[in-house]
Amino acid sequence: MSQTPLSPPPVGGRVVVAMSGGVDSSVTAALLKEQGHDVVGLTMRLYDHGKPLGPGARTCCAGQDIHDARRVADRLGIAHYVLDYESRFREDVIEPFAASYGRGETPIPCVLCNQTVKFRDLLAAALDLGGTALATGHYVRRLDGPEGPRLYRAVDPGRDQSYFLFATTKGQLGRLLFPLGAMASKDETRAIARRLGLAVGDKPDSQDICFVPDGDYAKVVERLRPGVVEAGEIVDLDGTVLGHHPGLIHFTVGQRRGVGIGGSAEPLYVIALDTATHRLVVGPHAALARREIAVSGLNWLGEGEGPASAGTRARIKIRHASPPFPGQIFPGAAAGEARVVLDEPAHGVAPGQAAVFYGLDDNDARVLGGGWIGASR
């Protein structure tokens, strides 16, 4: 089915840019300014780490990043505002992150952040400022289809962030711009930053979870959920105790390295995290095989209101870095649920991660939606 890039807002119209202080959002603002738009920058203050973060910190929306965003805005000659979203970020992202670990899941806080404080709250703020659209530095594409805007993977597969935006609604897509989705590579983005004299042109990409700058997420979870990081037994599929672990939070389904069990005739993988007994269940790779996946929190971006009752063919990603698996998506037993049946078993299906659906046309580039992974078999 044909699709074309959506027409940009009228030249001179106001576009609000979510500026994190990194090169991607900075170039986004610069490109829109070059195109003649009335650009306004918004930066979210999400988390107070108790001390300013230096230039080497690889997070986003922290002290140094806010400073960098303001410098870029000054360079571009655009208005720039900082919004204090710390309380709502804690409520909508950090607390659910900790609760998810307490349930033995492997959460993705970036999806929650996009779903709530960015595309709900920040978009509302952009509209309040008279903006016609909110632009971000995400590497995804928004194209026009017969029924309205669609979400597509970025041109550069190595930079594609569509997995993290599966929860973006159809209504939100109509108000969002992603100018970097058509970039051939990150090098092209950095080259634009240097051409425009932006100080962040060589700034490293953010790597850490923004509210865990030192990488010690267990400490954050323990502070929010005292007692959740509890040591326990490592057992095989028959319940035989093989060793002990420092806390389930340190493990995810499918993990092999760092389990701490040696001397086995074959490699052992994390099969399940039993939060009731604090047991870490390990087994052979074959025990990870799953074909059916229960999905909750379904967001549907394909045609109609959801997957077809007879099943919708798609390719399904169960982790950001995993290849998509062919299969079918069926409606679930309740609203907001779906059932995924893969053609062949996948390994490492972890509760708390997302199952994101891609269409079979256009080189699997169109995002049909997604949801949160629950039980699998």
UniProtKB/Swiss-Prot annotation:
The record's active-site residues are: 113, 210
> Which SUPFAM superfamilies does its entry note?
Adenine nucleotide alpha hydrolases-like
Species of the source: Rhodospirillum rubrum (strain ATCC 11170 / ATH 1.1.1 / DSM 467 / LMG 4362 / NCIMB 8255 / S1)
What the protein does?
A: Catalyzes the 2-thiolation of uridine at the wobble position (U34) of tRNA, leading to the formation of s(2)U34.
Gene name of the record: mnmA
Protein name (database record): tRNA-specific 2-thiouridylase MnmA
Keyword GTP-binding (UniProt): no
Top-rank taxon of the source lineage equals Bacteria
**Record's PANTHER family?**
MITOCHONDRIAL TRNA-SPECIFIC 2-THIOURIDYLASE 1, TRNA 5-METHYLAMINOMETHYL-2-THIOURIDYLATE -METHYLTRANSFERASE
Q: Which Pfam families match?
A: tRNA_Me_trans, tRNA_Me_trans_C, tRNA_Me_trans_M
